[in-house]
Amino acid sequence: MFVIQLATLSGFKVITTSSPSNFDLLKSYGAKYVFDYKSPTVIEDVSRAANGRLKYIFDCHATDNSTQTAVKTLPGAGGVVATLLYVDESTLDRKVEVHVPLLYKISGKAFPFGPRQMPASPEDKAWSEEWCVKLSKLVVEGNIRGNPIKVMGGLEAVAEGLKFMQEGNVHAQKLVYEVLKE
């Protein structure tokens, strides 16, 4: 939902997918079109809404299958898919650029990531410092809002929350644990 808001504020027409129970919620965050990700016509639905002008996709589900679907949705000229996990790029259309934005990169230091060693990136550190100021302002001004939350209780409820999440029961919300009650 954060990405939907940033894209909308940046002037993009946001087309997204979700389960039908979250259509209205995602529209309230700025999505112009929302389609059922389980629909057998989801690729055609998104393509039709984009009117052949789809260039950028953010895949927050981040599985090989979801990234493949994203790539198939892009028109023949290609485009850019940002995904949260590495995928086997050898199976993807060469006209598509795949980006994996890693939060760790904002430290500006090298770090191991699975079998890869990610290089230091002073540029990412400088970018993140600039954007932290901008994002803070957007939040304070009410232009960015957080996801709906589900309060699970105290730290004793963490195991329950992890099970809840592993069973696929977390949809369009963040699980929150009360560490200190005032």
Predicted features along the sequence, with ranges:
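Terminal helix/beta-alpha structural elements that buttress the NAD(P)+-binding lobe
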Residues: M1-E182
